[in-house]
Amino acid sequence: MSNAYKRVLLKLSGEALMGDDAFGINRATIERMVADIAEVVRLGTQLAVVIGGGNIFRGVAGGAAGMDRATADYMGMLATMMNALALQDAMRHAGIEARVQSALRMDQVVEPYIRPRAIRQLEEGKVVIFAAGTGNPFFTTDTAAALRGSEVGAEVVLKATKVDGVYSADPKKDPSATRYSSISFDEAIGRNLQVMDATAFALCRDQKLPIRVFSINKPGALKRIVQGEDEGTLVHV
């Protein structure tokens, strides 16, 4: 089966790395994610990753607790750096060559984000992990995913979540909620469906960059998406 996508941007939340733990990085969980990523890489699809930091620190929470919001956001960016290094290490153990590029310079640890270099590394078959969000406070890692996906020419943003798509209502609260197989950006806005934060969502819509929302906990889901199967929810123009 041929791949539906040549280049994709995978958005992983920091919380996804916790597994069943209350905090931090669950090694078994990250190894399972890397096994799914390895399948996609071996199929020949170029894969970039934007990773969050909510399993370690959330800037929004810090700001709400009285901390200076910009300072809290920078702390959140450093949390994404820790997650990116953990993901790179797990990939190395799985035989996948990965590079971490950071929006904040930390040259002794990771490479700075340089767009042409990132594209070249993707073309060479390496996984590129983007850390530190956009490098600016007040922007989420969802926005970083939309931005980096647009910059490197990804054909789709794959948003990995704990639910298997976009629903008409919260399925945990409403048993009658139905999952959308596909929905347009305008429909999602009109129905107030929280696919991503507004800035990220608007950027994807304006760049005509579709979003595929799927469950990171569903085995083989990432591979099925890359092969063009109907998995999760496609948000399109």
UniProtKB/Swiss-Prot annotation:
Q: Does the keyword Endoplasmic reticulum apply?
A: no
Q: Which residues bind UMP?
A: G53, D73, T134, G135, N136, P137, F138, F139, T140, T141
- Compartment list: Cytoplasm
One annotated GO molecular function: UMP kinase activity
Entry GO terms, CC: cytosol
Q: For this UniProt entry, what is the primary localization, expressed as one broad class?
A: cytoplasm
| Source domain of life | Bacteria
Please tell me where ATP binds in this chain: K11, L12, S13, G14, G54, R58, T161, Y167, D170
UniProt enzyme class: transferase
EC assignment: 2.7.4.22
Q: Which GO terms describe its biological process?
A: 'de novo' CTP biosynthetic process; UDP biosynthetic process
- Protein name as it appears in the record: Uridylate kinase
* Organism, as annotated: Burkholderia thailandensis (strain ATCC 700388 / DSM 13276 / CCUG 48851 / CIP 106301 / E264)
